[in-house]
Amino acid sequence: TLVPEKRQELTTEGGLDVAAQCSALARTRRRLNEAGIEVSLFITPDLPQVAAAARVGSQFVELHTGRFAEHFGNPARRKRELGRLITAARRAHQLGLRVNAGHGLNYRNLPALLEVPHLVELNIGHTIISRSVVVGLARAVREMLALMRPYDG
């Protein structure tokens, strides 16, 4: 997954602006594909970014779930962010892109995210490792997988 990085950023704070960098990203995508590497672009769940990712020729998009996670405690904002993710995932799927999602996902907010269709992969790391300090890695992973099991895509 290609992600933007800002100076002194501890974690990715937003998605790539694919629409503004189509040519450069298309060249990078082509080189990676020629080396046998499938490409995912980390984007905000906005339709112009989804369309740009398809134009670039990316095989995947990873939808940035940070705003969903950030607003999880506010039902109205959570619903709005979940709607953006659902709309973006549907459009990406229509355009032939495979859909991943990640950023800020945890044991509390993951069940609500499973309303998003067409998800192939979820990128979850910090919360599993944090939980593993208390319960061990095997149990932390089992607990997360149990939350994912009901997903029918």
What is each stretch, according to the model?
Residues D46-V56, A101, L105-L119:
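Catalytic cores of alpha/beta
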